[in-house]
Structures are given as structure tokens and as C-alpha cells.
Amino acid sequence: MERVASIMYLYPGNQEEYKKRHDELWPEMKEALKAHGAANYSIFLEEKTDTLFAYVEVEDKAIYDKIAETEICQKWWKYMAPIMKSNPNNSPVAVDLKEVFYLA
């Protein structure tokens, strides 16, 4: 498993809505994540800056990245775009993080 981490950014005032939408994550989106090899997926919020930290373990990063091509993922991005910084294609603005320490 490969560990993948990134940060994303909420627009101010959207912390509760972001959590609500993830509490109600569409079953089709859950299935797509699992089908693309995602496991142990967590998202944390730094409340003072509206910064999100996402961590996911993937079987194969290339396969995981293909989720972006799915209709359900693109629909999810469009649904989330009004509450977080997004790219022109509605994908979240995300900064990939480099792992600098790991303790098994």
C-alpha cells in the first residue's frame, strides 16, 4: 500500500457543511473509491485556517488517480466546488505532500 497525503482548502464558513456532506457521502462515491484501491481514507480539518489534510492508502496510485475520470467523481467535485477552492474542472485545489517520516 502506498500512503498518499494532501491538503485542500475550504471557503470560510463551510466547515459544518463540508462535514455534513461527507457524513452523507453518496454510496456510489464510496464504491468508486474502494474500486480504485482506496483504504483507510481520512480527512482532518484545521479549524482556524479552513485547511483540510487528507490521508489515504492506495494499492496503486495510477489506478487510484483514474477515479478522476469517473462520472461519479466529477459529479462529486461539482457538488463540492461551491464550498472549497476548486480548479476550473471542479476538482479540489490540492497540494500533494511529501512523506518525511514513517513509523510502522
UniProtKB/Swiss-Prot annotation:
* GO MF assignments: L-rhamnose mutarotase activity
State the reactions this protein catalyses: alpha-L-rhamnose = beta-L-rhamnose
Q: What is its main location?
A: cytoplasm
* Active site positions: 22 (proton donor)
* Record GO biological process: rhamnose catabolic process
Q: What are the protein's UniProt keywords?
A: Carbohydrate metabolism, Cytoplasm, Isomerase, Rhamnose metabolism
Q: What is its EC number?
A: 5.1.3.32
* Any GO CC annotation of this UniProt entry: cytoplasm
* Chain positions recorded as substrate binding sites: 18, 41, 76-77
Q: What is its subcellular localisation?
A: Cytoplasm
Give the enzyme class: isomerase
The record's function comment reads: Involved in the anomeric conversion of L-rhamnose.
Summarize subunit and interaction data from the UniProt record for this chain: Homodimer.
**Name of the featured protein:** L-rhamnose mutarotase
Q: Gene symbol?
A: rhaM
